[in-house]
Amino acid sequence: MDYKKTLNLPDTSFPMRGDLAKREPGWVQQWEENRVYQAIRAASKGRPLFILHDGPPYANGDIHIGHAVNKILKDIIVKSRSMAGYDAPYVPGWDCHGMPIEIQVEKKFGKNLPVTEVHAKARAYALEQLDRQRQDFKRLGVLGDWDNPYLTMNFSNEADEIRVLARILEKGYVFRGLKPVNWCFDCGSALAEAEVEYADRVDPAIDVAFPFTDKAALAGAFGLDSVDDGAIVIWTTTPWTIPSNQALNVHPEIEYALVRVSPTPVHGPLVLIAKERVEACLKTWGLEGEIIATAPGQALDGLRFAHPLARAAEGYDRTSPIYLGDYVTLDTGTGVVHSAPAYGIEDFVSCKNHGLADADILSPVMGDGKYIATLPLFGGLSIWDANPKIVEALKLAGSLMHVQKLSHSYMHCWRHKSPVIYRATSQWFAGMDVTPEGGGQTLRESALAGIEATTFYPAWGRARLQAMIANRPDWTLSRQRQWGVPMAFFVHKETGALHPRTVELLEEVAKRVEKSGIEAWQSLDPRELLGDEADSYEKNRDTLDVWFDSGSTHATVLGGKDHALHGSHGEQLAWPADLYLEGSDQHRGWFHSSLLTGCMLYGQPPYKGLLTHGFVVDGQGRKMSKSVGNVIAPQKVSDSLGAEILRLWVASTDYSGELSISDEILKRVVEGYRRIRNTLRFLLANVADFDGVNQAVPYGDLLEIDRYALVMTAQMQAEVQAHYQSYDFHPAVSRLQTFCSEDLGAFYLDILKDRLYTNAPGSHARRSAQTALLDITQTLVKLMAPILSFTAEEAWKVLADSALKHQADAARLTIFTEVYHTLPPYADADALAGRWGRLRAIRADVLRKLEDVRGEGLIGSSLQAEVDIYADGEDLALLSALGDDLRFVLIVSRATVHARAGELAIEIAPSAHKKCERCWHWRADVGQDADHPEICGRCVSNLFGAGESRAKA
C-alpha cells in the first residue's frame, strides 16, 4: 500500500514563486475593472475619517525612486488606517503651474508665443506628464481616486486660489514693496525660499579700502588730535556688489583699531579694522603694523568714507556712511561689512532704518544678470563676467588690499543649478510680522504656535521648522511668469494703489476663472468690471508663487476650515488633514507654505501631524546620480523583481534617515519576501480543504497549543497595529518576519505538521489545527496587506475560494474592504503565554541537544530520537501535563518526564524501534498489525479505527 497517499498533504493554488513582475499588472487591472477604490469607500462609509492630504508632485518627467518611496509610504498609511476601521480616502494630486513646464513649452515651441498659447500648451503638457506618472504610481500598487485627482490647474482650484488670495489680502497680510528677494537670472523671476539650494562655488574674495574723507571727525572718534591719510577696509566675496555700495557696517560693541602700516598703501599709512582681526589681516596683506588708537564701533557711527572706485570713474564720486549692525561678526574678514542695500537683506533693512528712500537705492543689475548700460566702467556686462574686471579696477584705483579665490557654499536655483542673488525688486509680499485686521497674533507668532500644536514624525522636524519660521523673511508671493495663477489685481496707473474694491473684484475674477481657467484673466477687459474707472487702472501681470498653489490646497481641495471654500474634493475630505507626508526638503517647501496659508486664513496649521522621510542613496550612501551610474529606477525594479519588492524595501527601511538601495540590498529584500511567501503558502495549503464556517471547532474546544497559537498571534497583531498607528513600519515588518520564521515556522507549524498530515481529515485534532490556522492566516494576510498589497490580495483570493467560500461577495472582491481580523479573547491568555513560553525555552534546549547528537552521527532526523527529561517543581508539572503529546511538541518518537531535584536535565538516545513508513515515528508497535505491518498503531487507528486522541498538541 502507498501510505503517502493516505496523508493529508498540503495543496494550494497559491504558487511558491511569486512571479511578481508578471502577475502584478493583472492585479492593477483587476483593481481598476472591479472599481476597488470605490468599493473601499462604500465599505468605509460612516467610519471615523482619516485624511492624509497628498503633497502634489510636479507634473514634469517620469517618477524616480524618491517619488516611489513617498507614494508607497502614503499607501501603507492609508491602507493600514482603512483596515484599522477608518474611512481613509486618498485623493492624489499634481502641481501643474510654474517654471519647469513653461520652460518645456519654450523648448518645444519657442519663446515668443502669445500667453493664450502658452497656457493651452502648458495644460496639454501637464496632462500628458501626469498621466505617465499616474500609470507608474498605479503600477506600485497604490490605491486612490486616480480617475478624479486634484490638479492645481483645474479651473475650480485656480478660482479658489484667487479666493484664498482675496481673503489674506482682506486680512491685511498682503503688501507691495521694494525688497531684496532671491532672484534667478535664468528664470527671470523671484524665487521662493524653497526654490533655493546651496552648492559650492569659487568666487574672488577681496579686501577693499574705502579712503578716509573727514579726517577730523575720524580723529575725534579715536580721541586723537589728527590722523594721516588712510582707509577703512572691508572683505567681501561678491565684487559685483561694490559698484552698488551705499554704506558700511560695524558692530557697536566691537573694538576697532587705527593701525599704522608699512610699506605704505596708495591710500595712506593708516587702516581701520576690528582690533581682533589686525594680526590676521596684516599677515594676509603682507604688511607690518602697529595699533595707534582704538575705539568701540559705537563711536564710528555716521562717519563717511570715499567709494573705492572714486579714482577710477566720476560716477563713483560719492561717500558711504557707517551704520551700526549687530549682525557684524569677527569670524572672517575685517570686522567691517560693506552694504549694498539692493543686494542683501540685512543691508536693505539697515539702510532703510537709516532713512534711505526706495528711490535712492542703487540697483544697477537687471533681471537677466547684466548691469544697466549706463553703469560706469561695467555697463552691459554680466555680473559674473564683471567680477574680474571690478577686481582689476579696484587694483588700478589703489583700493585693492588683497584678492584670493575662495570656495564657499552659495545659493543656487534648484531648477537651473545656476547661482542666485538677492535683488531688490518691487514685489507682492505676505508679511510675516503683520498683525491681521481685527488684531491677534502676527503670522510668524501664529505659525510658531501652530508648530507647537503639531505632532512631528520624527520629532526633530519640529525644531527644524521652528528655526525656519523664526528666521524667515516676508514671503515673496509674486512671480514674473506666464503659466501661473494670476495675482488678479487692478493697480492705479499713477499711484500704484490697489483698487478699493479689490476683494470684491477678485471674487468676480474667480467666478470667471471657475468657468474658463486662468485664461479668463488674460482675456478680461477691465471695463467689464471697472466701467469708466478702467482708464485709471492697469491689470497686474504677476503670477502667484507655485508654493502658494500647493500651499493653499488645504483650502482649494479639502475646502478649508468649516468648508469656508467648497474645495474640489471637499465632500469626501476634511480639514484639517490628519497627516501631511513628504521628504525632508518640504520643511522649507510644502509643509512651510501650507502652514503659512493655514495660519493666514484660519489662525492654525492645516494639518495635525507632519511625517518626514529621508532621501534615497545607494549602498555606499551616495546620492543617486546619472553621472555616477547608481540610479535605480522604480520602473525597472517593478519590471524585474516586482513592485512588491520595492514596497517591502520601503517598509523595512527606517525612513527617518537616508534610505539605502542597491541591487545587493534588494536581493536581501527578495529573500525576506520569499520567507514570508513560503509561510503564507504553507498556511493556505493546510486550510484548502477546510470550511471555515461549517467545520470550525469552537474556540474553547481547541487543543491547548492551538489556543496558545491564537494568543501568540493576538500579541503579534497588537504590536504590528501599534507600529502602524505610530507610522513605524520597519519594526512592523521585522515583527511580521519574526512571527513567520520563529513563532510559526520554527515552532508552531513545525509541531503541527504531524497532526495535519497524519490525523484523519475530519478529526477533532486536525480541525482544531485548521481552525487556528484559518484565524492566523486571516490575521497575517490582513496585517501584510498595507505593505505586501499584491501578495495579500492574491492570498485573499485563494482564501475566498476555499476556506472562506461562504463569505459575502463584497468581502471576496478585495482584501482592502476588510478590517483587521478579530481573534478570540481568552481569559487565560496570560497563563497560556506563560506556560508555552517556558515550554518553548525547554524545547529550544532539547533541540540544541538533538543537534549535538545528530552531529555525532547517532541519529538522522529528530524523530529517530527518544528523550528523557529530568525536572522538578513547576517544570515537572508543566511537562507532565502534556502526557504523550510532549513527543509531538519536541518532534521525537518518545518523550518521558522523570521527577528529579535540581536543574532540568535532558538525555537523548537513538530509538531501538522500527520506523513507521507513514508518520516516520520510531515506535515499538510498528509491525504489530498483521494487515499493516509497515506502520505504527497510531497510524492504524487514524486510518482504520477511531483515531488518536490529542488534548494539548
UniProtKB/Swiss-Prot annotation:
One GO process term, biological-process aspect: isoleucyl-tRNA aminoacylation
Catalytic activity field: tRNA(Ile) + L-isoleucine + ATP = L-isoleucyl-tRNA(Ile) + AMP + diphosphate
Q: What is its EC number?
A: 6.1.1.5
* Record-linked CDD domains: Anticodon_Ia_Ile_BEm (cd07960), IleRS_core (cd00818)
> Coiled coil: which residue ranges?
none
Cell compartments where the protein resides: Cytoplasm
> Where, by residue number, is the motif 'KMSKS' region?
623-627
Q: For binding L-isoleucyl-5'-AMP, which residues are annotated in this chain's numbering?
A: E582
User: Annotated Gene Ontology MF terms?
Assistant: aminoacyl-tRNA deacylase activity; ATP binding; isoleucine-tRNA ligase activity; tRNA binding; zinc ion binding
Q: Where does ATP bind?
A: K626
Provide the residue positions that the database annotates as binding Zn(2+).
C916, C919, C936, C939
Q: What class of enzyme is it?
A: ligase
> Which family, according to the similarity comment?
Belongs to the class-I aminoacyl-tRNA synthetase family. IleS type 1 subfamily.
**HAMAP family, A to Z:** Ile_tRNA_synth_type1
Purpose: Catalyzes the attachment of isoleucine to tRNA(Ile). As IleRS can inadvertently accommodate and process structurally similar amino acids such as valine, to avoid such errors it has two additional distinct tRNA(Ile)-dependent editing activities. One activity is designated as 'pretransfer' editing and involves the hydrolysis of activated Val-AMP. The other activity is designated 'posttransfer' editing and involves deacylation of mischarged Val-tRNA(Ile).
Reproduce the free-text note on domains from the UniProt record: IleRS has two distinct active sites: one for aminoacylation and one for editing. The misactivated valine is translocated from the active site to the editing site, which sterically excludes the correctly activated isoleucine. The single editing site contains two valyl binding pockets, one specific for each substrate (Val-AMP or Val-tRNA(Ile)).
Record protein name field: Isoleucine--tRNA ligase
Provenance organism: Bordetella avium (strain 197N)
Top-level taxonomy: Bacteria, Pseudomonadati, Pseudomonadota, Betaproteobacteria, Burkholderiales
